[in-house]
Amino acid sequence: MKDLARQRYDEACAHDRAGREAEAILCYEEALSLGLPDVRRRQALLGLGSSYRNVLRHVDAIALLRDAVAEYPDDAALQVFLALALWSGSREREAMQALARVTLESADLRGHGRAAQHYFNHLD
């Protein structure tokens, strides 16, 4: 079972790199349903969410990536791809808020974190 999940994951990545999003989506979904180790699971969730976004399935991308961020709150890449999906889904304010969170949590702002937080809180 795990070997098949890994095989489907590898196929998904190959399709993704080749720009064959529809095929990638099917393989990512199957790999995830079969069960992947934690590191591969994170990568598959990111790849699937990104592929959903690329085929304009913004609602699916946002839902999947929100769940992924809830499952892996320390994963900055998932947070960034959630922000991209939100932006593509015409939810620009939420996208900026998501980017603000990941920026404030992971970037070296050289002592300007409080100021950046203030400005992010007052974007309007």
Describe the role of every protein-language-model region.
Residues 14, 51, 85, 102, ...:
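TPR/TPR-like alpha-solenoid repeats
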Residues 25, 62, 93-100, 113-117:
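Conserved positions within tetratricopeptide repeat
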Residues 87-108, 121:
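TPR/TPR-like (Sel1-like) alpha-helical repeat modules
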Residues 2, 36-39, 73, 107:
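Short coil turns that delineate tetratricopeptide repeat
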Residues 6, 39-43, 77, 115:
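Start-of-helix register in tetratricopeptide repeats
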Residues 1-11, 15-17, 122:
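N-terminal alpha-helical interaction modules that lie
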Residues 10-71:
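Alpha-helical adaptor scaffolds
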